[in-house]
Amino acid sequence: MLHVYAYIQYIPIAAYSSSSSIRVIFLLFLTLSFLMWLSISFSSCSCPFLFPSSSSSLSSSYVSSSSSFSSDICSSSMSSSRVKSSSSSSSSLAFSPTYNSVSTSFSTSSCSKLDIPVSFLLAA
């Protein structure tokens, strides 16, 4: 903010200067410094509507591998009970060389249900 104030101080000097070349050079310098500030401040934004090329290169630089395992045993039946079990696990790894970050996620879930027939309960 301090450098912006320093530029604003010199605007009246350049605007009311007798030489037009000083005015043009100063306005060109002011415009270029403003454009450089905009490009630096928005270079980290990955919005696709503002920077489509940077967002596409960012999505192509991700190397991801995922593996998943799922088993569902619903049809195994015994004489006195039916066992339903389901388990799944998935892991994924994503690496971005642009931002030097590695993101890993691992999740597992399992569910088992023991369904005892009504006739077995009545016999007990």
Swiss-Prot record:
<dbReference type="GO" id="GO:0016020">
    <property type="term" value="C:membrane"/>
</dbReference>
<keyword id="KW-0812">Transmembrane</keyword>
<feature type="region of interest" description="Disordered">
    <location>
        <begin position="53"/>
        <end position="110"/>
    </location>
</feature>
<protein>
    <recommendedName>
        <fullName>Putative uncharacterized protein YBL053W</fullName>
    </recommendedName>
</protein>
<keyword id="KW-1133">Transmembrane helix</keyword>
<feature type="transmembrane region" description="Helical">
    <location>
        <begin position="27"/>
        <end position="51"/>
    </location>
</feature>
<keyword id="KW-0472">Membrane</keyword>
